[in-house]
Amino acid sequence: MAARTDSFDLAKLNLSSGEGRRLTLAVALDPFEFAGTEYAVDPARIDVTLDISRMTHDGYALRLRFAAALVGPCMRCLEDAAPSIDVDAREVDQAGGGEELSSPYVQGGELDLAQWARDAYALTLPNQVVCRADCAGLCPVCGANLNDDPGHAHERAPDPRWAKLRELRLE
C-alpha cells in the first residue's frame, strides 16, 4: 500500500550525491474540465512511482510515472469513454542553476507532488476523449449513434432554391 501524500520533503531522504531512491506514493487527482465537460480520473487516488536521484551538485533529478483513466462522455458519440493515459514526467531542480534547472514543483526542498502529477496528466491528455479511435459519432440530421448503425442514411433534402420549379407543370 502506498503512503498518502500530496507533497513530499526531499531532504528527509538524506540522499548523498549520486544516490537515488524509488518510492510509491498515493496522490489524489481532481476531475478535469475538458471542452466544457467534467471528466473524472479513475482511480481518483492513484499510486505513483517517484524516482529521486541526488545530483552531484546540490539538486535533484526527479521522475514521476503512473497510469489512470479519464472517465466521461465520448466527444463524438456521447457514450461512456475511459481511455487509459500513461504519464512519464521528469523534472530537475538544482540550486543556483537558473530557470532551466529550477523545478516549479520544488520549493524549499518540498516537492508539490499533487500539482506535478496533475500538470503532467493534463499535458498527456488527448486532443479528444473518444470511446474508441474509429468512433463514427452521431448523425448530424437525427442524432442517431452511427456506431450502432454504420449504414444509417437520410434522403437528401431538396435544394430550396429550386422549390418554385417543382410547382411548374409541363403538359
Tell where the protein language model's regions lie, with residue ranges:
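Structured interface patches
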Residues: M1-E171
